Amino acid sequence: MRRLLTLTTLLAGVPLAAPVCAEQVFSFQRAAGQLPKTVVPVSYGINISTDIDNLKLTGQETIQVDVRTPTEDVTLNQAGLHLAGAVLDNGVKATITQDDAAETATLHFPAKVSKGAHTLVITYSGPILKTPNGIYVDDYTAPSGETKRMLVTQFEVADARRMFPGWDEPAFKATFQLNVTLPKEAVAVSNMPVTQSTPEGTSQKRVSFATTPRMSTYLLALVAGDMKSVQGQADGTPLAVYAPSGLEEQGEYALHASEKILPYYNNYFGVKYPLPQMDMVAIPGNYQAGAMENWGLLTYIDNVLLFDPPNSTPRTRELIYEVVAHEMAHQWSGDLVTMGWWDNIWLNEGFASWM
Ligand SMILES: [Zn+2]
């Protein structure tokens, strides 16, 4: 009683501030964003062919879409790509307009596309960058002294659109099935396990990955190069740390950290880690993000993942544990449950940091 009286007295004595409002429950239609929500992607089948010497990629993707409001225009994101063609349901060709400043492309069809399920096939090409965003190459000095080239992706916040045209906003969740043609000697990893690897010509191979769960575009990832791994498991989930060949043993500490952290999080969140594997990769050098929580393929700049007992300090060991725990927390906070728009990224980051 006294507390209530005290509060009443206090409230009577000060001008009332604006009421505190909880945010509304998420609704896809209300979620902020720049793309129209008339057409929504359901699944992407992405085929890319990479030329890492000439820094070019060509792609063809098949997107299953759900048309929610009949429309003649389908607008999606692209950045730096050239869309060569877009065909709906095996026949209807679109006229394509690109707005490079807005990072979009609009596919204009001769008649309204009806409500419901449709298939969109887009062919395109674009650059592979040398700067660490979108799909890019990372040139580094290998332990052998040779200069080597790694193919890396970094999509958060809005650079998935540099690898494939799509609805590159976090609320547009869909499944992804990725197929990549790359040098035959490269080891390639993505969010999901490899399902098939077949030779292409004399110097390349085509690697296919299993279909992801529904997720946001910014969490898709691909890394390929001269890598080796150390492997373990926890709670039935295979775990691995990949590093440039010759450095993989330095991934042991992070691997053992992940083996302790995964069962703890499975129990803490009450939802078992839902992907069939969790890989972590050390990117040598050219990786501005520091570390990134791509779902099932966590990427780190090498000095926050690799621990070399004779040369690394105890502080490095602590830092590795901290960063691994942070990125693994994102597998739930951010990846499984994602903010509708970037204004709520604090929730992703705040929770992962708190864990
Ligand atoms: Zn984070």
From Swiss-Prot:
- UniProt EC number: 3.4.11.2
* EC supergroup of this enzyme: hydrolase
Tell me a GO cellular component.
Answer: cytoplasm
Name of one Pfam family that matches: Peptidase_M1_N
What GO molecular-function term can you cite, just one? Answer: metalloaminopeptidase activity
Q: Which residues bind Zn(2+)?
A: H326, H330, E349
Keywords assigned by UniProt, alphabetized: Aminopeptidase, Cytoplasm, Hydrolase, Metal-binding, Metalloprotease, Protease, Zinc
Report the domain of life of the source organism: Bacteria
The note on cofactor binding and number reads:
Binds 1 zinc ion per subunit.
Q: Which residues are annotated as active site?
A: E327 (proton acceptor)
Compartmental location: Cytoplasm
- What GO terms in the biological process aspect are recorded for it? peptide catabolic process; proteolysis
Q: Where on this chain does substrate bind?
A: E156, G290, A291, M292, E293, N294, E349
**Primary place of residence?**
cytoplasm
Q: Which cofactor does it need?
A: Zn(2+)
Write out the catalysed reaction: Release of an N-terminal amino acid, Xaa-|-Yaa- from a peptide, amide or arylamide. Xaa is preferably Ala, but may be most amino acids including Pro (slow action). When a terminal hydrophobic residue is followed by a prolyl residue, the two may be released as an intact Xaa-Pro dipeptide
The UniProt function text for this chain reads: Aminopeptidase N is involved in the degradation of intracellular peptides generated by protein breakdown during normal growth as well as in response to nutrient starvation.
- Give the record's family classification: Belongs to the peptidase M1 family.
Q: What is this protein called?
A: Aminopeptidase N
**Encoding gene (name):** pepN
